[in-house]
Amino acid sequence: MGLRSFVIPAVDIKDGKAVRLYKGDPEAVTVYGDDPVSVAKQWEEKGAKHLHIVDLDGAFEGKPKNIDIVKDIVKTVSIPVEFGGGLRSFEAVKSIVETGVERVVIGSLAYQNRQEFERIVSAYPGKVIVGIDAKDGKVAIKGWLEKTEYTPLDFARMFDDLDIWGFLYTDVNRDGAMVGPNIEGTKYLAQNLKHPVIASGGVGSVEDLKKLYDLKKYGVYGVVVGKALYEGKIKLEQLED
């Protein structure tokens, strides 16, 4: 697997458009396309091997709001899609899995309702990614609005024995800021967990990608990249496959 396969392009949906937030702030929005479906297709055409879809309206409102767009994306592309944003009940997860997405990212619910979370994992073994959003070294939930007392590793260890797919580790302070990823934090997490870790937040250059790619041996599976792809700092089609 080369660098290109390691990159998971992000398509963040807000108000029906493909956007990017700066450091998780719902007011700091850049719109990159009016049609998220064609944006998703474009990444596939440029050689993406998987996609990361986020329903930002869902994340802030607590339930998925853009299911039809997700359905259209899954129908249009032939690569696996992972989805996150507002999955805070079994029903919400069921409705998203039925669109044909490969994996679902769950953060707040895992923390707030263990029983419901375990029910989801039992129903969809190997399909659930636990989302770990870290803000100032502690895990944040509810669309990054509320901080918990857990460190990322303490939080992850609560779920590492379940039949999940793995973890998505986002450093919110770096997200959309292209200041470089949290290499140490990502490595530390991956080294200490049984399941794979997907990194996210802060990637701004091919150099950053290579640093994360070097962590594959510790269990880092890939990296979600948004802004750096949209701003042309990283050209997917130019990365080795």
From Swiss-Prot:
Catalytic activity: 1-(5-phospho-beta-D-ribosyl)-5-[(5-phospho-beta-D-ribosylamino)methylideneamino]imidazole-4-carboxamide = 5-[(5-phospho-1-deoxy-D-ribulos-1-ylimino)methylamino]-1-(5-phospho-beta-D-ribosyl)imidazole-4-carboxamide
Similarity comment: family membership: Belongs to the HisA/HisF family.
GO molecular function, one term: 1-(5-phosphoribosyl)-5-[(5-phosphoribosylamino)methylideneamino]imidazole-4-carboxamide isomerase activity
SUPFAM superfamilies with a match to the protein in the record: Ribulose-phoshate binding barrel (SSF51366)
Enzyme Commission number(s): 5.3.1.16
Protein name per UniProt: 1-(5-phosphoribosyl)-5-[(5-phosphoribosylamino)methylideneamino] imidazole-4-carboxamide isomerase
Keyword Phosphoprotein: no
Active site as annotated: D12 (proton acceptor), D133 (proton donor)
Chief place where the protein resides: cytoplasm
Compartment annotation: Cytoplasm
Repeat as UniProt keyword: no
Functional pathway: Amino-acid biosynthesis; L-histidine biosynthesis; L-histidine from 5-phospho-alpha-D-ribose 1-diphosphate: step 4/9
Keywords from the named record: Amino-acid biosynthesis, Cytoplasm, Histidine biosynthesis, Isomerase
Pfam families: His_biosynth (PF00977)
Organism lineage string: Bacteria, Pseudomonadati, Aquificota, Aquificia, Aquificales
GO cellular component: cytoplasm
Biological process terms in GO annotation: L-histidine biosynthetic process; L-tryptophan biosynthetic process
